[in-house]
Amino acid sequence: LQELSNKKLVLIDTSGAESLFVNSLKVQNIDLKKHLIISADCSEAAIARYFENNETWNSLLISKYSETVSVWPVINALMNKSTPLSIANENADLQTPLKNLKIRDLVVKNLKNMQLSLV
């Protein structure tokens, strides 16, 4: 990373299992901002693993977001942690603009998508 020290932004894509690499950067006193990227259809158990050990994230980004996909596990995680919601993408196409999102918007859209039935 020394050769990149003159850069304003360096993105490092790691899997959640590579926390040792991130910890080694912390030891080197490198200022890190960590952003969690999860799929819109991520399970609650998978999301909980990302927040184990009181991990702190600067923001949460949602990939594969669609207004028709139920994101209640994501909403639950955001409500239980103080991680701000950042942006979402609808597909892997880099030309597709990202969406700015707020937790309230996610809740409203998911409530509209719920199918209410009388029992």
Where are these regions (language model features)?
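Switch II (G3) loop of P-loop NTPases
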Residues: 1-28, 36-40
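Signal for well-folded cores of large energy- and translation-related assemblies
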Residues: 2-5, 26, 51-52, 66, ...
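Conserved beta-strand/loop subsegment of P-loop NTPase cores
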Residues: 32-38, 55-95
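Conserved ATPase-coupling elements of RecA-like P-loop NTPase cores
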Residues: 18-25, 45-49, 70-73
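Generic detector of bulky aromatic hydrophobic side chains
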Residues: 9, 22, 32, 57, ...
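Structured C-terminal portions of repeat-based eukaryotic scaffold domains
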Residues: 29, 47-54
